[in-house]
Regions:
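Short amphipathic alpha-helix with an adjacent loop that forms part of the alpha/beta core around
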Residues: 68-78
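N-terminal Rossmann-like dinucleotide-binding module
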Residues: 1-39
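Glycine-rich, highly charged phosphate/nucleotide-binding loops
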Residues: 60-70
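Conserved beta-strand segments that form the floor/walls of ligand-binding pockets within enzyme
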Residues: 60, 105, 148, 242, ...
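An anion-binding loop in the catalytic cleft
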Residues: 213-306
Length: 306
């Protein structure tokens, strides 16, 4: 099958790598434009563009695609199918309607649950034990197209965004190859999305702030959902502290939510117990363990997170 691949970040690059190993022919790639590095003005290509360049595949990086900008590229490459994995732009109707087999999207949830931009984070936030990949035929809605193939992925108690992302990317890559093969052979039939849906919105700063008046489990899930990026955070003595890793604490603890209840470890009172902030990064400093952080404080009395 002749395929144009549209994607941008690492997740998409892993899928493209697997696609290139398959019997399909990748005739072109579309990715987001290069963006300035955070600490310099140097333009950095996406992970997908880097991979395509290494494999000598023609790449388009249009600023806009709404008004036919991609049509000449599609007419030139003439794909049987367009594969879309975390591309980052909404596809207009002329793109959706172009290929024989339609536009196939790899989405990081078991649809219709967690439609939207952050399905992996929301699965962790909500303490799910299982999530997965859904391939679907794209329509003009947001993750509302007919489903093609689902792959389940188990979530372990110590998974964070990084580890679950990597498991999901590997599952997504295999799902993609199986989906294209099934479509071409007529072995996969599109299925309407049914049942309750929910939306995984973009992550904002307020969502990342830790509220210690919440339950321990809720706080634990928030920390792992945003680790290592964009990172959950709290404030200690007026300074922002990023939290990368936490551990639930057993036992009963006195004090009010947010109080630090140990002088040697950063154990913080919650609404129903306590949680240890094991690995942190104080504002402007490197990542460190909580014990090293506390050793560097002169006055530990009355310490609190808020």
């Amino acid at each position: 099958m002749r395929v144009v691949f549209m994607g941008s970040p690492d997740f998409a690059a892993i899928c493209l790598e697997r696609l290139l190993e398959s019997d399909n022919e990748v005739v072109g790639v579309v990715s987001q434009p290069d963006k300035p590095h955070k600490r310099s003005s140097k333009l950095i290509p996406t992970a997908v563009k880097k991979l395509a360049a290494e494999r000598n595949i023609e790449v388009e990086t249009p600023d806009k695609i709404k008004n036919g900008e991609l049509l000449p590229f599609l007419e030139k490459t003439n794909p049987d199918c367009i594969v879309v994995v975390a591309y980052g732009k909404i596809l207009p109707k002329y793109v959706l309607d172009f290929p024989k087999y339609g536009c196939v999207n790899i989405h990081g949830s078991l649809l219709p649950k967690y439609r939207g931009a952050a399905p992996i984070q929301f699965a962790l936030l909500n303490g799910e034990k299982k999530t997965g990949i859904t391939s679907m035929l794209m329509d003009e809605g947001l993750d509302t197209g007919d489903m093609l193939l689902k792959t389940e992925v188990e979530i372990s108690d110590d998974d964070n965004f990084e580890t679950l992302h990597d498991k999901m990317a590997a599952a997504g890559a295999e799902n993609l190859v199986k989906t294209l093969s099934g479509l071409e052979k007529g072995e996969i039939k599109p299925e309407k999305q049914t049942g309750d849906s929910c939306y995984a919105s973009l992550i904002d700063k307020e969502m990342r702030k830790i509220d210690f008046s919440a339950a321990t489990e809720e706080i634990y899930n928030k920390i792992r959902a945003f680790s290592p990026v964009p990172t959950a955070f709290t404030t200690i003595s007026g300074s922002i502290v990023k939290v990368y890793k936490a551990k639930r604490e057993n036992g009963s603890f006195s004090g009010k939510p947010g109080d630090v209840v140990s002088e040697t470890q950063l154990i913080v009172k919650t609404s129903d117990g306590a949680i240890r902030l094991c690995e942190i990064a104080p504002e402007g400093k490197r990542r460190m363990d909580d014990e090293a952080f506390l050793r560097g404080l002169r006055d530990k009395k009355g310490l609190a997170c808020n």
